[in-house]
Amino acid sequence: MVPLVAVVSGPRAQLFACLLRLGTQQVGPLQLHTGASHAARNHYEVLVLGGGSGGITMAARMKRKVGAENVAIVEPSERHFYQPIWTLVGAGAKQLSSSGRPTASVIPSGVEWIKARVTELNPDKNCIHTDDDEKISYRYLIIALGIQLDYEKIKGLPEGFAHPKIGSNYSVKTVEKTWKALQDFKEGNAIFTFPNTPVKCAGAPQKIMYLSEAYFRKTGKRSKANIIFNTSLGAIFGVKKYADALQEIIQERNLTVNYKKNLIEVRADKQEAVFENLDKPGETQVISYEMLHVTPPMSPPDVLKTSPVADAAGWVDVDKETLQHRRYPNVFGIGDCTNLPTSKTAAAVAAQSGILDRTISVIMKNQTPTKKYDGYTSCPLVTGYNRVILAEFDYKAEPLETFPFDQSKERLSMYLMKADLMPFLYWNMMLRGYWGGPAFLRKLFHLGMS
């Protein structure tokens, strides 16, 4: 058992104190990074590929380790988005503008921003190439390139998004279309899909279904809506405890769930969706819709698929406990682009960042990593405009809950955490390299027991 004094007086004291002050103390904005230009140098101690959640977080951590002038981030995008909030944007509960900030404002101060796209990785020569023909070498490489959205793998998309009845919470270009389709709904089928590929935030495709059902009830349209969730999977959720809770909600709210159904075509002009039956190859079904929410197929970024750092499926091939590459000891991976066998979420990235920080630290000292990632990930399953089931679990698909109560129950407190606390932690702590997940809070709330 860990005494309370040991928790609050150790190296996590600053973070713990900050959590206690949430809601009573304002935190200033991130320091603006003004060096948004191509690198003047062509070699860095630590080179980070990708300016998403994993890339920015690790750059902040590496800055403290080797100095800002020795760290660079390769990222072409002008804006950085907190994507988990898009579930609420698509349901009209948050504004899209609240989810994004200029990339320059989240790059750690002093870290070089190489505003370019990676076109080739050459780990045998410790260098990468960019789309402006620059060659950049490194001593340590962190790959945080995220996951690629493949709307075009569905016939009729992305051009079908020009029609007003279709939306998708997975893209900044289409998330507001979900809210428009929801508002314009009159009568008929509201269809929500889950593709036959790995996805980021695997709970999001059904979260918008629950929110839509709540919206229909709120606006008096529920009796006119036939709500359908067509998923390529064989279960509603991968962890039994939470799957059982979700099944109860599905039954109570009269939602239709069809398993092993994969969206292959959208006929937007006819308002029809075509699904293949994964259990019976060649068998298809056409369903008309009044509203369609599409979760696109996803894959590793193209630059990784043929790279030496990728496994056979195209994901960065890392050790699942240390996040160190299996073949190149000075290469590391974090987040959605890796083959880590856990759910691809921002919460997973936070937990991974603490482990990877420790891994790189000991490798820099020519030591063997001992700190191990347990696969922790979290999915706040939004089941209404004021209710969330907070799913937390590990590699074994066993619950790994932070709070000392049953998190499979719908709770207002967990919704407020999803809507307000988590964005605060993301912008003000995680991206600054000070949030490595709730493991220490779990020990505190459970009186030191794992």
Swiss-Prot record:
CC annotations in GO: mitochondrial inner membrane; mitochondrion
UniProt cross-references to Gene3D superfamilies, sorted A to Z: FAD/NAD(P)-binding domain
Keyword Phosphoprotein recorded: yes
GO MF annotations in UniProt: FAD binding; glutathione-dependent sulfide quinone oxidoreductase activity; quinone binding; sulfide:quinone oxidoreductase activity
Enzyme nomenclature, EC number: 1.8.5.8
Localization annotation: Mitochondrion
Binding positions (FAD): 53-54, 75, 83, 118, 336, 344-347
Main location class: mitochondrion
Function summary: Catalyzes the oxidation of hydrogen sulfide with the help of a quinone, such as ubiquinone-10, giving rise to thiosulfate and ultimately to sulfane (molecular sulfur) atoms. Requires an additional electron acceptor; can use sulfite, sulfide or cyanide (in vitro). It is believed the in vivo electron acceptor is glutathione.
Disease: Sulfide:quinone oxidoreductase deficiency: An autosomal recessive disorder of hydrogen sulfide metabolism characterized by a variable phenotype. Some patients present with encephalopathy, clinical manifestations of Leigh syndrome, and may have a fatal disease course. Others are asymptomatic. Additional features may include lactic acidosis and decreased mitochondrial respiratory chain complex IV activity in tissues.
Stated name of the protein: Sulfide:quinone oxidoreductase, mitochondrial
Protein species of origin: Homo sapiens
Gene field: SQOR
